[in-house]
Amino acid sequence: MSNRFAVILAAGKGTRMKSKLYKVLHPVCGKPMVQHVVDQVSQLGLQKLVTVVGHGAEMVQEQLGNVSEFALQAEQLGTAHAVDQAAGVLANEEGTTLVICGDTPLITAETMEALLQQHKEAGAMATVLTAYIEEPAGYGRIVRNENGHVEKIVEHKDANEKELAIKEINTGTYCFDNKALFASLSKVSNDNVQGEYYLPDVIEILKNEGHIVSAYQTEHFDETLGVNDRVALSQAEIIMKNRINRKNMVNGVTIIDPSNTYISADAIIGSDTVLHPGTIIEGNTVIGSDCEIGPHTVIRDSEIGDRTIIRQSTVHDSKLGTEVSVGPFAHIRPDSVIGDEVRVGNFVEIKKTVFGNRSKASHLSYIGDAQVGEDVNLGCGSITVNYDGKNKFKTVIGNGVFIGCNSNLVAPVTVEDGAYVAAGSTITENVPSKALSVARARQVNKEDYVDQLLNKKKS
């Protein structure tokens, strides 16, 4: 196999997005558009990848890191001009170069591989990825000669009446013989309505020089959708969401209502897990097998063990063990580690806490900056008082501890193994192992007080 290279065009300003965020960094199913493209082209066995950047270059470089080299298009003068900015990296290389736009997040490695194979089998100097659509307005048209070969590509704004009737369109993805590509770029003119240097003109240049120009017509037009505004962004989101949901269902995940379930592109979900409506799985979340998630649950960048149930709750940047029960209406905040067979009940908030195996906080509790041992019971209304207005402090609760209802543990404080804390206590000192700590005022009953009070009011 000959050397393979790729150029991703990501220098457009994206003015139609009307956004401060660089266009190709707008997310689709939780991942920036350009990252989707990079992830797919990286499966093609490339020797070099060059991303052409312009406005917002630093943000794109930060997103992609060292998986790509970068070339700067300081002034946007057209797609041919953009590709030419990669000459310093690629111009002298032997091989095949794929050119693709960074705002086409739906393109797949399979389609690009088919394009490359067509290019090789045809012995072509250039091959165009095309599609046939009923409403081609706005797209460049593929003009073929009497032999069916690609003669040229005409931009919509420059097309005559006959050319506008053509329904085979240019998707904006190509592959070229690398040296032929860079040799032809200097011959491209900007003599057109827009005054720009069009990459499709390279096709006509190569054809006029007697080279073979081939085309691969994809059946999956939706893969070629370019995102230039918020409407197209929403369309891409829907298509990608459906693709991700279908992939998970094929792999054994039950999604009760796919139209109302959102899964990020990088999430991994085990078989026989059930997702109820309103479930949102974000980021690099990993969910085990035989889980039940939702309804109306958000999980972000977290790891969920097998046979765990999460209902109407939120989990962020945390790790949950196996056979955990969460919710309804619980909130597990970042940097929490929840052990196996744990119960986190309704209106319980856990933050930056290690919560041991088989421990329970079943109702109305806040556990923050804490280390909770195994087999602990936190009664309704248990609170770790971790903040003094300036600093956060740690609470340590040992194994087998029982915390009575409506108790406050004022950190820094330790409740040692096997200790009991009486209901209604405010604990400000360490509790020894197996001790009972009572920290509340003694009850006083005043006999006949109510009658005396009422009689006093009457007099």
From Swiss-Prot:
UniProt: acetyl-CoA binding residues: N386, Y387, A423, R440
Binding site residues for Mg(2+): D103, N228
Matching InterPro entries: Bifunctional_GlmU, GlmU-like, GlmU_C_LbH, Hexapep, Hexapep_transf_CS, NTP_transferase_dom, Nucleotide-diphossugar_trans, Trimer_LpxA-like_sf
EC number: 2.7.7.23, 2.3.1.157
One GO cellular component term noted in the UniProt record for this chain: membrane
Catalysed reactions, semicolon-separated: alpha-D-glucosamine 1-phosphate + acetyl-CoA = N-acetyl-alpha-D-glucosamine 1-phosphate + CoA + H(+); N-acetyl-alpha-D-glucosamine 1-phosphate + UTP + H(+) = UDP-N-acetyl-alpha-D-glucosamine + diphosphate
Official protein name in the record: Bifunctional protein GlmU
Organism for this UniProt entry: Bacillus thuringiensis subsp. konkukian (strain 97-27)
